[in-house]
């Protein structure tokens, strides 16, 4: 039994050691629990501090001065604004270089002007399209400016060309000149550099001028068609006196005021939108979106116009002039009868002039329809298939819309100078007189001898030259060189 005593002593020692460990374990776990609760409290405190910091960030923008901001805070914002997720980019899960990456998206440093993209140099794949657009724009610009200026100057400086008919043609040339001179450079600059000249002002002014030009052309074609019908059915003398300026200006005012009134909603519909790009900073584009700051009644009217714009555009600026011109021509042909049945009281010269005027109206209508048809087709495609088209396709359709208007402004004066014999002859005389100094004396001598009688007959028989009862001596056609 003696061996039991060492065993009992050893068991007692082991039991004492175990009890001591158990008694000391509760404070250990309690200490750990207290440490965890303190850590959670400290974490919650840090979270509240972060929330307070975020609240301060929202109301005190000076703390974010080192990060990029939107260029126009009051304007349209991108769907994913470039805002850092933490006031300290290197902490709390943020990458240390996130601020530098966000700043690299802009083309210039804060406080400096944005750099303009130049796709022409160095030469890349996009440079070829940029060169093609510039070349086409230069050709259209040169032809349109020279042609429209020629028509306006010829009508203005020639005494016998100041009639309502020629004044309407000159007003067409004036609006085409304004569209080419002001709108074409802005559109081409935006297409090449993705930056908008004059910002929101040009986004509103360019559509207004283009729609006004279409309205002037539409109402001018209707007025010319009415004039042709009136001449065909009138019993008054075919040669009428030269109209006064007040009468001509009154007729032009009706056309201009009506066209500009119908184009006023374009000023309220368009606005500038800026979108961030990974390599080029911000991209400027014009979108159809009425401003939310408009009055409620005006905003609803603009929204109604936006919803009905496509069909209004198609009906008023495409179908109306074509149908009106075709109807007037058919009625005029019906009143006059077939071309083979000529009246004895009508001279051959007068028949030629009437045929020439009818050809002018028909030619203007055909050119107008040919130039506005692509624009209307693109509008219909964008209205119904915009969700299925890519951004590049939509941009291409928008460029086609713009160039169709510019083509109309460049082709119309060329057609007038080719079809209208008085305008074309005056243009050739002016070019000859300006380019060749000896042409002036020779033309005067020849006109004094043999061409005087021919000019008188053309003046008296053409509607372009309304000869008054007591007219001064005949003046040379064209502008004084």
UniProtKB/Swiss-Prot annotation:
Pfam families registered for this protein in UniProt: 7tm_1
PANTHER family named among the record's database cross-references:
G-PROTEIN COUPLED RECEPTOR 37-LIKE 1, PROSAPOSIN RECEPTOR GPR37 FAMILY MEMBER
Q: Which residues lie on this side of the membrane: Cytoplasmic?
A: 156-167, 227-251, 332-361, 420-481
Residues with Phosphoserine modification: 471
**Start and end residues of each stretch annotated as Disordered:** 26-58, 70-108
Q: Which UniProt keywords apply?
A: Cell membrane, Cell projection, Disulfide bond, G-protein coupled receptor, Glycoprotein, Membrane, Phosphoprotein, Receptor, Signal, Transducer, Transmembrane, Transmembrane helix, Ubl conjugation
What is the species of this protein? Homo sapiens (Human)
Question: In its UniProt entry, what is this protein called?
Answer: G-protein coupled receptor 37-like 1
Q: How is it modified after translation?
A: O-glycosylated. Undergoes metalloprotease-mediated cleavage which reduces its constitutive activity.
Q: SUPFAM superfamilies in the record, alphabetically?
A: Family A G protein-coupled receptor-like
The disulfide bonds in this chain are 203-286
Q: Report quaternary structure and partners.
A: Interacts with the PTCH1 receptor.
Query: Where does the UniProt annotation locate this protein?
Result: Cell membrane; Cell projection, Cilium membrane
- Give the GO molecular function terms: G protein-coupled peptide receptor activity; G protein-coupled receptor activity; peptide binding; prosaposin receptor activity
Per the record, the similarity remark reads: Belongs to the G-protein coupled receptor 1 family.
Q: What does this protein do?
A: G-protein coupled receptor. Has been shown to bind the neuroprotective and glioprotective factor prosaposin (PSAP), leading to endocytosis followed by an ERK phosphorylation cascade. However, other studies have shown that prosaposin does not increase activity. It has been suggested that GPR37L1 is a constitutively active receptor which signals through the guanine nucleotide-binding protein G(s) subunit alpha. Participates in the regulation of postnatal cerebellar development by modulating the Shh pathway.
Q: What is said about the domains? A: The N-terminal region is required for constitutive signal transduction.
The main location is membrane
- Glycosylated residues, chain numbering: 79, 85-86, 95, 105, 107
In this entry, the parts of the chain located on the Extracellular side of the membrane are: 26-134, 189-205, 273-310, 383-398
Q: Report which gene this protein is encoded by.
A: GPR37L1
Q: How does it sit in the membrane?
A: Multi-pass membrane protein
Using the record's annotations, give every residue carrying the modification Phosphothreonine: 479
What tissues is it present in? Expressed in primary cortical astrocytes (at protein level). Expressed in the central nervous system.
